[in-house]
Every structure is written in structure tokens, then in C-alpha cells.
């Protein structure tokens, strides 16, 4: 269901070798290729309920991940997804919901709105329509996502340089918290500078606080946030990568790294790019 020890491969940017952690390979098809699924597997395995619900967002693969895990474990998935006005009456207009349906999930659309309201609506619908059910935490902020990604970072540590710069794209920061926790457990974090590239603009202080609390770490001044002002629905433009890369997250970070001016600022040691997934 999950692939551990995903490879570290070397790619070049402007003649500079970049070590890329290929977490896009962590879940084979028909699963979604993003490393947050590590925590989804562990979390659902520990739930006794037979029906597992999940709230999706505009470009989230959360419902797809939950549907994949539920199919593997013999549970029923329910994917709640936001219907925008531009969707009209289209049935499952986005590919991630189509994949969830193919894996056996029930699809329930909710008029798009604020995430907290959508989550409350989904929870109420699930409770009223599905016996023995459970709704996954919003944004899949799972403690298991931290512990499982930390474990993968520890497994990867022997294949990485003893020092350098780590570049990670972040949304909520859950996966990054796990990776940083793993680097700390492996004795690497003290020797690494860390660049957290924000997939969309929001409070850096709140994001740092969440990551530090989730990882049980004090990050200090070696952690640098890069906020290029992206909106949540913005995809990277005029950018490509030589490996599968999510246009809403990792590809933005790769595009930033591809800029020679940005790359020059971190050329004081090896560079590790943690590709969370496609």
C-alpha cells in the first residue's frame, strides 16, 4: 500500500546538483502520489469505524487518498468536495474526485465556502447518513502524518550529506513537521539550513508555531520561509521539473530554486529538495 525508502536522485539546476527525495513514489497507482498518505494509512488502520469521511478542497488529494486506503482496508469512503459556481451541474469535475469514485468512494458535493463551515456540514451529513462513521481531521492534520514522515526521513538520512540545505514546499506544514522531526532524530537537523517554500501566502508566525508544536522542536533562525504571494488556487506557471511535481506546491518551490539568483544564495553546501508528491 505504501512504499518506504523512496529513492534520492540527483538532478541538475544551472549546473548545480540537487538531491531530490522522490516521495512522489510513495504510493503506487491507483493511489495518489503524495507523502501525506503515509499518515492516512496509519490513522485509518487505527480507526474501528467502517465508514471514513473526508473533506476535500479545490485541489486537494485528501479524498483520493482516503478512498485508496479504505479500498485496501475494506472500508467505505465518503468524499465531501466543494462545488463552485463555475462547476455548474458537472458531476465530479475534478480528477481527484473521479479517482476517489473509481476506488469506491461515495461523492457528496457541498456548496463552496469557508473550510470550517464545510467541515461542520460534512460532519453533520456523515453522522446523519452513515452508521458507524468517522470524519478525518480537516486538512489531514494527523499526528500519524508527522510520525510516519519522520520515520521515512530517518530511513533516508544515511543517503544524505551530513550537512547542507533542505528545501520543502509547505501547505499546512504537517509533512514538513514530520521531515524536520526525522532530521532531528537522525542527528542531521543541527547541520542543515531549512527553506520552507509556502504554497500559498499566510501567516509565517502561525505556520512556524504549528510546525514547532507538531514536531516538538524549536526551529531557530536556520529556518527561512519563502512567501511569493501565491493564492491558494494559484498553480505554478511557466515551470517544469524532471520528476512528477505538484503544480500547487512542490513545483512552485522548484521554480523558485531554478532562479539562478535564488540558487546562488544557498550554494554553501549540498541541496536536498524534498518532493512531497505530484
UniProtKB/Swiss-Prot annotation:
Keywords: Decarboxylase, Host-virus interaction, Inhibition of host innate immune response by virus, Lyase, Restriction-modification system evasion by virus, Viral immunoevasion
Disulfide bonds listed in the record: none
Tree of life domain: Viruses
Enzymatic reactions: 5-C(alpha)-glycyl-dTMP in DNA + H(+) = 5-aminoethyl-dUMP in DNA + CO2
Biological processes per GO annotation: symbiont-mediated evasion of host restriction-modification system; symbiont-mediated suppression of host innate immune response
GO MF terms, alphabetically ordered: carboxy-lyase activity
One protein family per Pfam: PALP
Function summary: Converts 5-Calpha-glycinylthymidine (Calpha-GlyT) into 5-aminoethyl-2'-deoxyuridine (5-NedU) as a step in the pathway leading to thymidine hypermodifications in the viral genome. As a final result of the pathway of hypermodification, 5-aminoethyl-2'-deoxyuridine (5-NedU) substitutes for about 30% of thymidines in the viral DNA. These modifications probably prevent degradation of viral genome by the host restriction-modification antiviral defense system.
Family: Belongs to the pyridoxal-phosphate-dependent aminodecarboxylase family.
UniProt protein name: Glycyl-dTMP PLP-dependent decarboxylase
Organism: Pseudomonas phage M6
